[in-house]
Amino acid sequence: MRPADTWKDYELLDATDGNRLERWGETLLIRPDPQVVWKTPKQSPLWAKADAIYHRSNQGGGEWEYRRRLPEKWKISCGEGEDKLTLIVSPTGFKHTGVFPEQAVNWAWYQQKIRAANRPVKVLNLFGYTGGATLACAAAGATVCHVDASKGIVAWGKDNAAASGLADKPIRWLVDDCAKFVAREKRRGN
């Protein structure tokens, strides 16, 4: 297993009893995580200082409890130099923040493979979400087709591209159902 250790602005501080304590820039968030099945004593005194806590609802979904006023969105950075990405964080109604920080190790791997190819590389990113993988590939020189079914999420991805200085890179942003998109492209011979 390779850790996602290229983050300057994100840190998993502690995890226990179904929850994660994370630092997103200067903001501390507590979010539920079903993979955190152990019940150990909380190791960090920062649990009590969290800026916001996401509470799941028994009916599905949930809501954020804000302990202090937070901006609607803020930026964090991952990587350095030509690999640096600036991503917009915004707590959503379904516990996510717009970034899956554990994916940074995959983004770095994509970049290494794209740069080592010594030829033009095209990437199809299905279910592209807010574009972390898309931007990593574009920063490494790939031409990217980013597909997600949510118009708002694709707009967020474009905002991330602008924040990262990658708005002019060859990225095709598509709002479409991924399965239908692939079926259409297959029929077209692409």
What are these regions (language model features)?
Residues 130-142:
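Conserved SAM-binding loop of SAM-dependent methyltransferases across substrates and taxa
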Residues 150-190:
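S-adenosyl-L-methionine
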